[in-house]
């Protein structure tokens, strides 16, 4: 009886560890951010990678590992086309745990696309939490005056990043 119980506990731990490893993210990883609604031409991508950041600016400073998320979106209409919004924000979240807002910047082009819209870029590289396949990365509307975050216009999960 005791041996059966130990065997069952060992098997449960092995299966639990195997499923946890099966869901680990392979870095670096890029995902395509898909339009949430039918908005012509918009497209985006996110690059998720591990980076080493020094603790200080001093030479030889020890480094700490963080996860960085970079977001690129193109052919984006002005945010005001969707209502009371004046910017886009990248947004990464582990559902029901934690989220990060990513400041986005419009890229001024020398020769804008005749399709319209503008590219927006941003990155955040201070994530210490372990990301999972269920992590959602999106580009959302935002109002800088009220700090109100609007709905997502592009979105995807990290499921395509699983080893």
Regions inferred by a protein language model and the residue ranges of each:
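Bacterial N-terminal signal peptides
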Residues: 8-16
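Bacterial N-terminal signal peptides that target proteins for export
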Residues: 1-7
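N-terminal targeting/export leaders
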Residues: 20-163
